[in-house]
């Protein structure tokens, strides 16, 4: 486990540490993505090569191979230390196009959902369900449902399981205010 010295040092620290797994928030991924796209677009025919590479990588992923993306986008992977194979993110929504681009580079991406009161993960996608526009399915022993969904399926997320907060430690008054 390693922690960066600060925002301005993240890329330098990643090259030094060479992580295989990177846990971050969507905003950081979007910033990295913008820099990657800008760098690729600055090259002659960079955008066309990027589109071709994405297409070839997606075909490879459909057949269970991530190596095509890793080879085609090796230069990008090297900026993250060269060994990055998995990014785990959550805490806010991630642009599905950003998720797709990282996945086509041969990097798996797990997007999760949770709350402080649920210690914190409730749902996450995984090897079998790696969607770019979803936080996946509930973890084992967790039940989740959309309460009173509207016509579009939008409603409040209700969660039940052993990881849900039982109350505030030694503070029954505060507990009574939030849990009925």
Where are the predicted features?
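Glycine-rich loops and low-complexity Gly/Arg-rich segments
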Residues: 1-3, 25-29, 46-49, 112-114, ...
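ATP-dependent adenylate-forming carboxylate-activation enzymes
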Residues: 1-17, 23
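Conserved AMP-binding/adenylate-forming
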Residues: 22, 61-64, 68-180
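Alpha-helix N-cap/helix-start capping motif
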Residues: 7-8, 26-27, 47, 53, ...
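Alpha-helical "lid/cap" subdomains adjacent to substrate-binding clefts that gate access
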Residues: 17-85
